[in-house]
Amino acid sequence: MPTTRCSGPFLVVAPLSLIAQWQSEIALWSPDINCVVMHGSQQARDIILSYEFYYHEAFTPKADVQALRKKNACKFDVLLTTYEICMKDIKLFTKIDWKVLIVDEAHRLKNHQARLFEVMKTIPRQQCVLLTGTPLQNKTEELWALLHFADPTKFKNQHEFVSQFGDLRDATDVAKLHSVLKPYLLRRVKEDVEKTLPPKEEVIVEVRNFIQFSHFAGHFYYCNIE
């Protein structure tokens, strides 16, 4: 997979709460990249589709436009969107051959029988990157779902994967699973990201008057819910 000067289009699917952060980081680290956010009402998305997706003769020579349209070339380099919009406009996203599909908070794909998984699996892509802090939450079936999404050819049989790694009875089983994951998993640890952070320090504070504390904690919780 090329690491530099790789042209798009790239599709980033993330929760709505992270879209602004993605947009900010792209602007900071790659200001020359044309990044478009696909979100909002149907009318707003139609406008984005009309003016931001493909080249038009009003802004580009006619001959160039015709050539670009034959290639189905996109105006943007990166398209940011949410899970919800991706599901609503899936017919649009499946018409584009994406260079890379990036899925943030990818643990939402842990259920391979869910509609979200089935819909997003139809998106054409040459490469796939899944970002998650919890690739394995409860069951090895969830890990298989992510691996199947990333490489459905190699990880096509859930039963076979679970029968081999489902129990993880001893260190040997864990080592085998690690060897399978190694080509697919890039783990980020604190030491690699920020070397100036001090060592973790835990402080245990004894809380007295627990009944009174519980009353205030419950009141604070319900106030936030409301």
Task: Give the predicted meaning of each segment.
Residues 1-170, 178-203, 208-226:
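ASCE P-loop NTPase motor core, strongest for the SF2 helicase catalytic module
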